[in-house]
Amino acid sequence: LRLQGVFWEGNCTCILEIQVYKVRIPEDAFWVTNWFSREAICRFHQVEEGTQGFLEMLGKYGAAMRRMHQNIFFITLDDRCMVSKSPWKFDFEYLTPMIQCFFDAGMKRMELGTLLHRGFLENGEPNMYTDSFVCSLETGLKFDTLEGYAHTVELVKSLAKYLRFHGWEKQVLFHIHDEPDIHYKKPEDLEARRREYYLAASILRKYLPGVSVIEAVESAGFYGGVDVWVPGTAGYEARKEEFDRLIRLGEQVWTYVCCSPEGWWLNRFLDFPLIRGRLLFWGCAKNRIQGFLHWGFNQFPEGMDPFRGTSCPNDTGIGTNFPCGDSFLVYPGPGGPEIGMRLEAQRRGAEDAALWGLLRENEEALHDRLLGEVFVNNHTYCQDPQKLEEVYERLLKELESC
């Protein structure tokens, strides 16, 4: 390949030698989801949800997600679906064009949620340390009451009917409540939460058979309630034996990063070397982790301009702003999302995870040995780009000969 460029000092020719390996990257061999903000899309691109302009812009965001091999999208349920409170009645058709837009873009599954909420303090902040949940769509209603139960049953029954009508019931992952075992003060508080969580899970499974419950967690303590476990990388390392046992049992374990960990830990923050965002996925391959979740694709709250400030405000009341770049991978350009280098690093990481999976199917011992030259755990690794490329090339050579 010859590329000829013109500079102000004269002409030069750049010769690139490219080695093409006879290896195809498996598509959708590794689960990836990045949560997005519909409100931020509307605000930055001057479109209104439910309009054709919004759907066209959403399609551009979906294409950006697919570029980095994202194959799952998250639709948060809101009170627009609630058409009556006495009796409880729900209508989800307003979500249909948006859901179809993502499936048309090539997505394979969707996340829905949530059923439960922590409620609010008197000052309006979320009640992060609560020992009991309220209904997510009706936050003035305690979940652990007969009326809360009735509300939730009617909600799930209506949702199940809607999903079956569109043929989507087998493509759903459901969040009951994000991080249910994080932020509590006493063991009794956690146990009270767990009892309510299991009740919600039983309602889901009764009226939407076959649904998979997915949740970001800190431990394996909600066994029997969760189907797809998503510990943070630090939580996984702290309880590696627990989560590895779940993997050996045949359960799905993914991972995520959010707010932390910082320092030498692998993460995708804006002030971290790009290679760390890619190595996150090498760690997934090494640990037999089947998916990656992140909360921040374009999470720009009101007043945040990612071109001027990179830290997202934290409204939970339990900490400072989120670290720089934690809340986004794309920038809101004039014609749609503009892709950043961190998205490209995540794209390569997802491709790598799929390729490592191919090698493990054929040569598991070699898979572990090669990965071990670069990755030990999520805070012990080699971030020398040359070494990474050397191991990557050996991976491709091995796959070519398989």
Predicted regions and their residues:
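Catalytic cores of alpha/beta
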Residues: 281
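Aromatic-lined carbohydrate-binding surfaces of glycoside hydrolases
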Residues: 2-5, 12-207, 215-227, 260-261, ...
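Glycine-rich anion-binding loop/nest that anchors nucleotide
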Residues: 257, 290-306
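Glycoside hydrolase catalytic-domain groove-lining segments
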Residues: 222-263
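Active-site clefts of carbohydrate-active enzymes
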Residues: 182, 248-278, 296-297
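Catalytic domains of carbohydrate-active enzymes that cleave complex glycans
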Residues: 140, 144, 148, 152-189, ...
